[in-house]
Amino acid sequence: MEAREPGRPTPTYHLVPNTSQSQVEEDVSSPPQRSSETMQLKKEISLLNGVSLVVGNMIGSGIFVSPKGVLVHTASYGMSLIVWAIGGLFSVVGALCYAELGTTITKSGASYAYILEAFGGFIAFIRLWVSLLVVEPTGQAIIAITFANYIIQPSFPSCDPPYLACRLLAAACICLLTFVNCAYVKWGTRVQDTFTYAKVVALIAIIVMGLVKLCQGHSEHFQDAFEGSSWDMGNLSLALYSALFSYSGWDTLNFVTEEIKNPERNLPLAIGISMPIVTLIYILTNVAYYTVLNISDVLSSDAVAVTFADQTFGMFSWTIPIAVALSCFGGLNASIFASSRLFFVGSREGHLPDLLSMIHIERFTPIPALLFNCTMALIYLIVEDVFQLINYFSFSYWFFVGLSVVGQLYLRWKEPKRPRPLKLSVFFPIVFCICSVFLVIVPLFTDTINSLIGIGIALSGVPFYFMGVYLPESRRPLFIRNVLAAITRGTQQLCFCVLTELDVAEEKKDERKTD
């Protein structure tokens, strides 16, 4: 890992084919050919692809499986729906703040890139470290396991599916989607589009069925909707936390900003389209659940959508477990697509080994970063209680998201003349920062042990930053340098990859912004 000096060009490697003398003479006599393409990730994500990425990553298995996380802390349907609406509104505010950040700092990497721009390399590295070590691989392992469970469970109706079979199918799912994203960016976006449509159609079917029941007069569950509501601030805080976890993923498109066509237009537009869609779907889906199921049914169900389907879909109830699996598959694809770009950008900034910022010379996909992401997720499949690990990063997740928006306010003050294609009222980032402080403090009191473990995981990156980034390369252990050089060379040959070139136009634009 090498920290590059500001202004120093990124080293580039070019594959030069062997040519015979006759070939050279033939080339001289032939018409001049177009110069080779610049070795960079290509802008292949359209507005529709962007909407699919955001919606597909936000709508995971949670809305199908465990909306009871909000209900258990609110104790009433009325208060539960209010919390879902507040969670959606808060997520919309955060997404709008990220839309401004994404059009102002046109780099991939989401909060990592924004923290790097505002506060420098150390805090950005810690943010990258937490994602690399826990957040991304744990989340992907859990999604893959959930997918495998819903695929295998119908074959074992009276017992739990075999542990090893679930883990092997989860591993196959991760490897398949990694291959798809290594092959072509378009393959990844087409998979995303298809599975996003599938999960939205499944949720619309649930919503329509619920509204039909409601129109038929089944409104008894809403007659005293707020009866028994919990007004305890601690419980309401935990309910909001559960809702916000289901809304997570609204920053997906910010991880791939550099690959979006016309990002200054399409990034905020995709966010503006996606957020109302997801918020409306979540609220209406819960209304459908609450129309058919009473509170005890919801709280006792391991998969609320499946229980709902058993009571309403009749012979077609089998479609909902399939829909949950498809939703997980699409969500996993979006996560792999986004997190690989995070590692790619981290490598390009000198915070990870150079080999992770290589791309295939013909397909223009970050194959080493994708393979690294795949390896980390597969390692976490070995951990038997991988679901426990998700409790460690709720504190750090909201800390870094909030810090990104603090950076937005800081850059407003530090660089007031910097061009901002989208400039929000300062009211939005201030409100989001205040709410983020609340979301950071709550786990420290309600889940102290797990929060402290999360802080410890973040701080474990400090010695790695010192050894791999802060320390000059000449002072790092020779053995480590030789090993990294050998791995980099082998990866380049095996994956047919080279380091990306600096985008001169983008660099000049960034210089004009900071002048």
Curated annotation (Swiss-Prot):
Positions on the Extracellular side per record topology: 66-78, 136-167, 216-235, 288-311, 385, 447-451
A biological-process GO annotation: glycine betaine transport
Origin: domain of life: Eukaryota
Which GO CC annotations does the UniProt entry carry? plasma membrane
Q: How is its activity regulated?
A: Arginine transport is strongly inhibited by lysine, glutamate, leucine, glutamine, methionine and histidine, in the presence of Na(+). Also inhibited by protein kinase C (PKC) and treatment with phorbol-12-myristate-13-acetate (PMA).
The entry's family comment says: Belongs to the amino acid-polyamine-organocation (APC) superfamily. L-type amino acid transporter (LAT) (TC 2.A.3.8) family.
The entry's protein name is: Y+L amino acid transporter 2
Organism whose genome encodes this protein: Homo sapiens (Human)
Q: What is the lineage of its organism?
A: Eukaryota, Metazoa, Chordata, Craniata, Vertebrata
Which gene underlies this protein? Answer: SLC7A6
